[in-house]
Amino acid sequence: KTNKDLIKEASQMFGKTLITHQTGPQGKKVKKLNSTGFVIKAQIHAGGRGKAGGIKIVKNFAELVKEAKNIFGKTLVTHQTGPSGREVKRLYVEETCDIAEEFYLSCLVDRSSSKIAFISSAEGGVDIEQVAKKNPQKIVTVKINLSKSVSEEDIKKIIQPFSLSNKSKKQAYNLINSIYKVLIEKDASLIEINPLVLNKNEDLLCLDAKINFDDNALYRHPDIVSLKDFNEEDLIETEA
């Protein structure tokens, strides 16, 4: 199970995927994806995988096997791994999709105001911190009292940066309510979807998802603890 799976349980806005611990994904499993193209992602706990060669787009199964062998076991060095890098021990494979637009959406605990903050932007697929520095006017922040649910008016404000049809607006309403529910029920401190894409059929899809959890609340969530990949944990932190 991955971060995407947690959100998928409440919202169906994901393409078909598989995770493999082997150098070459099994043919039968890949064929179930029923796609003419695939995205391979190195599963390491660090950002910047794409620039380090940890994300590849391929057109067919033969290319998929070739690139999987190239990435598996490779040490990726990114701005978040430090100079020693991280060895790739798992691969995540998903279907490609025809992207029309890329958005950014996150939901987090804003400790300064003791509220839940939704952050959205039409500038998806890039580092949101860079967008905040260069184009702060392109970011929308909506804060919600913890004692309340997300109202229709809140959602209208959250999706204001997005160009959505009535069909995709309904999907956005479902997604926003879903990630709010996951954040509260699982004691998460952050849920980030980047990018949230609109495809050519005007469907919203979550292409990448990140969830941070409150370590002090993990005792209430053995299902979350079971997701831990100790190969990706810092040895000193784990011992501590």
Region spans (language model):
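ATP-dependent carboxylate/acyl-activation modules
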Residues: 1-17, 30-192, 197-240
